[in-house]
From Swiss-Prot:
Record-stated family: Belongs to the cytochrome b family.
Note from the entry: Heme 1 (or BL or b562) is low-potential and absorbs at about 562 nm, and heme 2 (or BH or b566) is high-potential and absorbs at about 566 nm.
Record-given protein name: Cytochrome b
GO BP terms, alphabetized: mitochondrial electron transport, ubiquinol to cytochrome c
Example GO molecular function: ubiquinol-cytochrome-c reductase activity
PANTHER family: CYTOCHROME B
Function: Component of the ubiquinol-cytochrome c reductase complex (complex III or cytochrome b-c1 complex) that is part of the mitochondrial respiratory chain. The b-c1 complex mediates electron transfer from ubiquinol to cytochrome c. Contributes to the generation of a proton gradient across the mitochondrial membrane that is then used for ATP synthesis.
Keyword annotations: Electron transport, Heme, Iron, Membrane, Metal-binding, Mitochondrion, Mitochondrion inner membrane, Respiratory chain, Transmembrane, Transmembrane helix, Transport, Ubiquinone
Domain of life assignment: Eukaryota
Annotated organism of origin: Tupaia belangeri
Length: 379
């Protein structure tokens, strides 16, 4: 059996990736989120496939088809809420995974990091299109507001928006194409995940100390497979609790009203995992400036490896950088809160201060902290 595992053309790849893979002996539970994200992706594709069997991508029947899934399909409500709350768990794991990468200097593996940022972008696009599909009030107005942002692009903006809409407003054509993209993108994400793992296994995992771990490696199985199973059990327990006890906790009540182009909801807001970017968008009075800031809130991650000035890779022994990192986390939580608030005083000012601080920490303060720590260590 061992021979087959090591020699069979297909099993050999799985063996080198998940069984005999040499892994650092000291990686903590923060390294669990990669496997949890893989599990979330499989769960989303599986539940999404069953939902697609009963869903109709038509403006007149989309809302009714989702209601039909919840009421008439066997365990349809479980599948629907697993999919909706599974997306929330997916993004929670994504943000923790990116945060781990920032804290422990995983961004120094350039190719892996860049593919990861592309994955984050693609996942956000997929989730946005999925939010439009139930065709509730927030689905319709969210799609209208966010796609309309592209009209801020000089010269081609208006044409681009109408091209995406497939007409002069968000309508049947928009819903149909969003469903098509929402269905195909998870498979593109799966392909990108394979590339992400390919680049990761070229270098091997980093570790909490940020030092070379070639001298002390252990096999991935059984040590980290058991550790990953614990993470999966915890994640499934939290997800089950959400789905079975408060499935609408993270949703918006407005989405239980069918889309009405003649009635604008008092507060248009996306799902919680987009609120930080939405707050940055709203904090800039100029439309084009807001769109640029929105894009940069994620794209800035691509510049992080080039802004690394410290001679140590990880933040484990860098107290000043640690303080800045946790201020950044608090700032992102503040932005998430602001994104869900109405556009009025004092929320506008808090959002603007938090947005400036977000970019200042990453672009200015982190590199300065790295230099200062080098100086204090007499390097």
């Amino acid at each position: 059996m061992a021979n087959m595992r090591k020699n069979h053309p297909l099993l050999k790849i799985i063996n080198h990736s998940f069984i005999d893979l040499p892994a650092p002996s000291n990686i903590s539970s923060w390294w669990n989120f990669g496997s949890l994200l893989g599990m979330c992706l499989v769960l989303q594709i599986a539940t999404g496939l069953f939902l697609a069997m009963h869903y109709t991508a038509d403006t007149t029947t989309a809302f009714s088809s989702v209601t039909h899934i919840c009421r008439d399909v066997n365990y349809g409500w479980v599948i629907r809420y697993l999919h909706a709350n599974g997306a929330s768990m997916f993004f929670a794991c994504l943000f923790l995974h990116v945060g781990r990468g920032l804290y422990y200097g995983s961004y120094m593996y350039l190719e892996t990091w860049n593919i990861g940022v592309i994955l984050l972008f693609t996942t956000m696009a997929t989730a946005f299109m999925g939010y439009v599909l139930p065709w509730g009030q927030m689905s319709f107005w969210g799609a209208t507001v966010i796609t309309n942002l592209l009209s801020a692009i000089p010269y081609v903006g208006t044409d681009l928006v109408e091209w995406i809409w497939g007409g002069f407003s968000v309508d049947k054509a928009t819903l149909t194409r969003f469903f098509a993209f929402h269905f195909i993108l998870p498979f593109i994400i799966t392909a990108l995940v394979i590339v992400h793992l390919l680049f990761l296994h070229e270098t091997g995992s980093s570790n909490p100390l940020g030092i070379d771990s070639d001298a002390d490696k252990i096999p991935f199985h059984p040590y980290y497979t058991i550790k990953d199973i614990l993470g999966v059990v915890v994640l499934l327990a939290v997800l089950s609790g959400l789905v079975l006890f408060s499935p609408d906790l993270l949703g918006d009540p407005d989405n239980y009203m069918p889309a009405n182009p003649l009635n604008t909801p008092p507060h248009i807001k996306p799902e919680w995992y987009f609120l930080f970017a939405y707050a940055i968008l709203r904090s800039i009075p100029n439309k084009l400036g807001g769109v640029v800031a929105l894009a940069m809130s994620i794209l800035i991650l691509l510049f992080v490896p080039f802004l690394h000035t410290s001679k140590q890779r990880s933040m484990t022994f860098r107290p000043i950088s640690q303080c800045l990192f946790w201020i950044l986390v608090a700032d992102l939580i503040t932005l998430t809160w602001i994104g869900g608030q109405p556009v009025e005083h004092p929320f506008i000012l808090i959002g603007q201060v938090a947005s400036v601080l977000y970019f200042a920490i990453i672009i200015i303060l982190m590199p300065l902290a790295g230099w200062l720590e080098n100086y204090l260590m007499k390097w």
